[in-house]
């Protein structure tokens, strides 16, 4: 089944089930029998699904719930006695009251000026564009209710504050908004049945307001679920979520809201929307197993066509225009063979009547300096003449800001990180004698004395296809001294690439590795130990070590040698590109979604998969840093208590006696040794075997 068809079936199953299902139940109900991995890859479909973590009942573990999401809305300009939309929008022309259950005008014996049909040419075109033309009317209404905020009556915020039967609401019973507990609707009310706020849509006060809108009794009974779904979708789609997503948050798909600001979730989505840096350098060892996008440029422009993302033509010209903050929209075509052009709106990220998106490589501030073809984001502010000024740039008529684009980008990424608090939403800086605050939510900078605001813009630095070719062929080196270990073979340092050096069983280096392995696996026989020499990975690891040491006030970083079991088919890919838990297999997720490393080889042996009696295991060098007990829902270490932007470095199974470490940032790991061992066919007696037997017997005396 084509992917668009599978996406359509998942959407239909969810909408038929009330808009959301637990992940295992969703998989069970699908007709095509998707594997768990295939379903999770499918759920990365941008804008089609949201995965939320909801607390289980009583002592039950948290549950991953999949929700049907969509940018589809009712056209507000079409509503009312004088519909004002001429049909150029990408939204449904449908009577709002019909969606509620029954048109109040028809019930009163009057004519309704709004459309009551989904089969008009306009509506059918909109449904096909959004890939939902196969849904039934009820399924479509469910999708609209939990995604279109205009359809849901507003909850009175004043009612949810203060004491008294109506909280602090001055209108009391005359209030046109619903008086109901907002925390109940979010699934977060800790008071339950003892809550002083109403949890009932059917009480006389709320029911009267809902019936005036024409809501059916069936719809009223479903409102708690609808509001809960809408809350989770909004929380995931328009703000840095405090509920960890299903996938690790590092994607860089560019999506914007109507104000022109980048939605924070664009930095917190899965890496499946991120272009693979190794593929651009023609060196991705994971190949078709890589979870990132493989493309020949560090950017990719696409539009949504019938639920599937398609490439736009002339991406280089689009990218060049987008990199200019003065340009808000351009005309472009979807392919060279078509004569039809549509407007690509950079602020709204729309292409004609449908959605558009920009995929890109990782932000340059998240990678070491020598990584090529990362995305350099430039931050601008609009001056009093409407000209865009780059942060930190000298040589202009304006005072130089005390923060650069790089500083702003780092702060913005911290704000977009799941778990960041409200303090991370702003960045204070100076320019001349004035103090300012940059607000990442509103995308404005504010003068803290006069209160004046200026627009803020974030655009990438342009990289042409010729620039890509040049950077691919140039031998970019790390700007700093090489510090390879003195025991490495300096004649075996391919750059790029790696080489494995087989260690002599009589060497001290071999014995150190063997002793660590033998401590918990004394009856397993080591066939070979190889040292991995990858100059690029080693330099990245040393750079990461330096960064962590700076953040630690100059103190040494806790560095350990830990084991990681894997399948032999992934060994070369790991040696080339480091560990990636999405590709190399999951070692459980009890303490977070990351790469698992163990103090004991016996633990890692359980994950050393092999069809023969020969197994493979890594002994890695790991920067564990400061750690905290992990949790299955973590997609990165949590923030330190009392800090807004300071996070732990790793998660463990026990803080007092850790034996399992979860690493979320692969630069904290270097795959130092590959151990090949067997569970049978005892080899001839060697000094290492005698040493093993001697240590074993002495430990039993």
UniProtKB/Swiss-Prot annotation:
PANTHER family hit by this protein: POLY [ADP-RIBOSE] POLYMERASE, PROTEIN MONO-ADP-RIBOSYLTRANSFERASE PARP12
ZnF segments: C3H1-type: 94-119, 150-179, 180-202, 270-297, 271-296
Gene3D superfamilies: 3.30.1370.210, 3.30.720.50, 3.90.228.10, Winged helix-like DNA-binding domain superfamily/Winged helix DNA-binding domain
Domain (PARP catalytic) ranges: 484-698
Result of changing residue 564 to A: Catalytically inactive mutant
CDD domains: TCCD_inducible_PARP_like
UniProt record similarity statement: Belongs to the ARTD/PARP family.
BP GO terms, sorted: protein auto-ADP-ribosylation
Stretches with biased composition (Polar residues): 259-268
Residue(s) carrying ADP-ribosyl aspartic acid: 600, 611
Keywords from the UniProt entry: ADP-ribosylation, Cytoplasm, Glycosyltransferase, Golgi apparatus, Metal-binding, NAD, Nucleotidyltransferase, Nucleus, Phosphoprotein, Repeat, Transferase, Zinc, Zinc-finger
EC class of the enzyme, as a word: transferase
Protein name per UniProt: Protein mono-ADP-ribosyltransferase PARP12
Sequence ranges assigned to domain WWE in this UniProt record: 298-361, 364-458
Stretches the record annotates as Disordered: 234-268
Localization, UniProt: Nucleus; Golgi apparatus, trans-Golgi network; Cytoplasm, Stress granule
Entry GO terms, CC: nucleus
PTM-bearing positions, type ADP-ribosylcysteine: 474
GO molecular function: NAD+ poly-ADP-ribosyltransferase activity; NAD+-protein mono-ADP-ribosyltransferase activity; NAD+-protein-aspartate ADP-ribosyltransferase activity; NAD+-protein-cysteine ADP-ribosyltransferase activity; nucleotidyltransferase activity; RNA binding; zinc ion binding
Annotated EC: 2.4.2.-
